[in-house]
Amino acid sequence: MSDTPKRCGFAAVIGSPNAGKSTLVNALVGEKVTIVTHKVQTTRFAVRGVALAGETQIVLVDTPGVFAPKTRLDKSMVAAAWSGAGEADTIMHVVDAGARARMEHGGAKSGDSRMVEDDDRVTEGLKKTEQKAILVLNKVDLMPRDQLLAMSQELYETGVYSEVFMISAKTGSGVPQLREFIAGLMPEGVWHYPADQVADLPARILAAEITREKVYLRLHEELPYASMVETEVWKKLRDGSLRIEQSIIVERETQKPIVLGKGGSAVKSIGEASRKELEEVLGCKVHLFLNVKVDAKWMARRSHYKDVGLDFDV
C-alpha cells in the first residue's frame, strides 16, 4: 500500500470559444469526455472530466467559452464559465497562441480578432476576481519559439498568471507535464469518483451531447449555432440493449431540411455516427432513433437550462 497521501481537487479550464479547452480536457483525462467541433461555443455547460496522476485525482471543469454575450443562452454560458472558475482549486486559462500570433505578425484568419478580444476579457475578469491562473498557450507546435517567448512574457506581465505552459492539446505535446503540475496543486483528500470513472455527466445528457457533436461535425457550415439535442426516451431492453429516442431541435422551419438532408441522408449519417460512439461509451448495443423538431423559442424555455445546470435567470 502506498504511503503517498491521496489528493483530490478541482481545476477549471477557461478561455475563449474554440481555444482548445475541450481538446485539452480530453487529453488530460486520456479519454473523450467532452465534445469537440469546428463551431465556437460548443461547450454550453461545465462538463467534469476526471484525470489521474499517481495518487491524485484531478476533477477538470471544462467550462463554456468566455465571450461577449448577446442572448439569454450566451449570458447563462458565460456565467457558468465564471462559476466553474470561482469554485476551483486552480484555474487554467487556455489561449490559442496561433490566433494571437497571427494578429500580431500578419496572416490573421476569420475569428482571430474576436478570439484575442475574448482572451483579454478573461484576463480582465481574472484581475477583477484577484484569482491567479495558469496560462496555457495552446496550438504552439507550428509557432517560432521567439514569438512564443515574447507572447508569454507579455501575458505574464499582466500579473494574473502564476505559471506559463506551452502545449499542443491536439498532439499531446506538453500535456503530461501540465497534468503533473496541476496534480501538485491539488489538496489532500479522498477521491470524489471511482478510479475508473472519467466523467461526471448523466448518461442521458452525455448521449445528447454526443449526437449534438455529430450534428455540428456533419453540418458545421450549414447549420447555425442555435440548435440542441434532447434525449426523450431511454429504455433498457430485455436483451441488454438500449433504445434511445432523441430530438434535434432547430429554431426555424428552413433549418429542418438541412438537418434531414436529401432523402434523409444527413440525419441518417448523424444517427449512424452517434450510435457507433454511444455503443463504445455505454458498452452495449444501442437502437438510436432521431427526430427533427422546430421550436422557435427553445432558448427561452427554462426546462432546457435546468437540464444542463445553466442558470436561466442570470
Swiss-Prot record:
This protein's record includes keyword Disulfide bond: no
Membrane topology value: Peripheral membrane protein
GO terms for MF: GTP binding; GTPase activity; ribosomal small subunit binding; small ribosomal subunit rRNA binding
Region (G2) residue spans: 41-45
Subcellular location: Cytoplasm; Cell inner membrane
Cited Pfam families: KH_2, MMR_HSR1
InterPro entries: G_ERA_dom (IPR030388), GTP-bd (IPR006073), GTPase_Era-like (IPR005662), KH_dom-like_a/b (IPR015946), KH_dom_type_2 (IPR004044), KH_sf_prok-type (IPR009019), P-loop_NTPase (IPR027417), Small_GTP-bd (IPR005225)
Region (G3): 62-65
G1 as annotated region, ranges: 15-22
GO cellular component terms listed in the entry, alphabetical order: cytosol; plasma membrane
Domain Era-type G residues, every copy: 7-188
Chain intervals for the UniProt region annotation (G5): 167-169
Coiled coil: none
Residues noted as binding GTP in the record, renumbered to the chain: 15-22, 62-66, 138-141
Annotated KH type-2 domain residues: 219-296
Keywords: Cell inner membrane, Cell membrane, Cytoplasm, GTP-binding, Membrane, Nucleotide-binding, Ribosome biogenesis, RNA-binding, rRNA-binding
Gene Ontology BP, a term: ribosomal small subunit assembly
Region G4, annotated ranges: 138-141
PANTHER family assigned: GTPASE ERA (PTHR42698), GTPASE ERA, MITOCHONDRIAL (PTHR42698:SF1)
The protein's role, per its UniProt record: An essential GTPase that binds both GDP and GTP, with rapid nucleotide exchange. Plays a role in 16S rRNA processing and 30S ribosomal subunit biogenesis and possibly also in cell cycle regulation and energy metabolism.
Subunit structure of this chain's protein: Monomer.
Family classification: Belongs to the TRAFAC class TrmE-Era-EngA-EngB-Septin-like GTPase superfamily. Era GTPase family.
Protein name in the entry: GTPase Era
